[in-house]
UniProtKB/Swiss-Prot annotation:
Keywords of this entry: Actin capping, Actin-binding, Cytoplasm, Cytoskeleton, Nucleus
Family to which this protein belongs: Belongs to the F-actin-capping protein beta subunit family.
GO BP terms in the entry: actin cortical patch organization; barbed-end actin filament capping; cell morphogenesis; mating projection actin fusion focus assembly; mitotic actomyosin contractile ring assembly; mitotic actomyosin contractile ring contraction
Protein's organism: Schizosaccharomyces pombe (strain 972 / ATCC 24843) (Fission yeast)
Name of the protein this chain belongs to: F-actin-capping protein subunit beta
InterPro entries according to UniProt: CapZ_alpha/beta (IPR037282), CapZ_alpha/beta_2 (IPR042276), CAPZB (IPR001698), CAPZB_N (IPR043175), F-actin_capping_bsu_CS (IPR019771)
Pfam family, one: F_actin_cap_B
Subcellular location: Cytoplasm, Cytoskeleton, Actin patch; Cytoplasm, Cytoskeleton; Nucleus
Length: 268
């Protein structure tokens, strides 16, 4: 196993909540891996406030140019940057509309949080990223969704191939940050899940394209949320139920003895 694969394998096994800290630690030891790790490892999203509109937005590689980040609300960089990368007028118009649509989706499904949509031009069409962050008031729990998509033209008129890669970074804690440091005081669950999908959909105008992207994100989030609930949390619940009993051990021992006796009789 080479150093790149070893670093990625290590990060997959560590707590997703601490992935930024762990990534910095690895890069301090192996700085030559910076390009590979920073481009392939999704980190929890950070929040900034647009100085012009007052709206919050999320920071990521998709709105970064150097050390500056572009606000999807004002289309300006912070710190200010001359000749920063911006999209064409049509793609920028789509970006504004998608930000408004995802904000409505955020209020309906998450009852608050921060969302950002960033679009950029490609040769024949465009691509983008839909970002969603929902954290508890104490920041002891959080949900980060990162949806990266591209819209590719086909041989059919007004029909496009949409390819979506979605990542969810989830961490939950049953106690405060002080309690989380003590294993006996809190239960901590963390997960990192990535899925891909593609669909061929008609899009005769901008409104249809916005609806298509919204549909893809909504369906993918629902599918991933159900998977986490049924498989990840379901398996965790089974493990806890097997290792924890609400009745005293002394009360359970007679039942265990009786069960073993029955099993022994059945095996004869």
């Amino acid at each position: 196993m080479n150093s790149e694969d070893a670093a990625l394998d290590l990060l997959r096994r560590l707590n997703p909540k601490d992935i930024s800290k762990n990534l910095d630690t690895i890069l301090s030891v192996a700085p030559d891996l910076a390009d590979v790790l920073l481009s392939s490892v999704d980190q929890p999203l950070k929040v900034n406030t647009c100085s012009e509109s007052g709206n919050q937005y999320l920071l990521c590689d998709f709105n970064r140019d150097g050390d500056s980040y572009r606000s999807p609300w004002s289309n300006k960089y912070d710190p200010p940057l001359e000749d920063g990368l911006v999209s064409t007028d049509r793609v920028r118009k789509l970006e504004v509309s998608l930000n408004e649509a995802i904000r409505v989706y955020l209020d309906l499904y998450y009852e608050g949080g921060v969302s950002s949509v960033y679009l950029w031009d490609q040769d024949d069409s465009y691509a983008g990223a839909v970002l969603i962050k929902k954290a508890s008031t104490s920041n002891s729990s959080g949900w980060d969704s990162i949806h990266v998509f591209e819209c590719l033209p086909t041989t059919e008129t007004n029909v496009y191939d949409y390819r979506l890669t979605s990542t969810i970074i989830l961490f939950l804690s049953s106690g405060s940050e002080e309690q989380s440091a003590l294993p006996s005081k809190a239960l901590n669950l963390s997960g990192h899940l990535t899925r891909q999908t593609s669909q061929r959909l008609p899009a005769a105008d901008d409104d249809t394209e916005i609806a298509n992207v919204g549909k893809l994100v909504e369906e993918m989030e629902t599918r991933m949320r159900n998977f986490l609930q049924d498989v990840y949390f379901g398996k965790t619940k089974d493990i806890i139920n097997q290792t924890r009993s609400i009745q005293p051990v002394s009360d359970a021992q007679p039942n265990d003895s009786a069960l073993r006796s029955v099993l022994n009789d059945l095996s004869i």
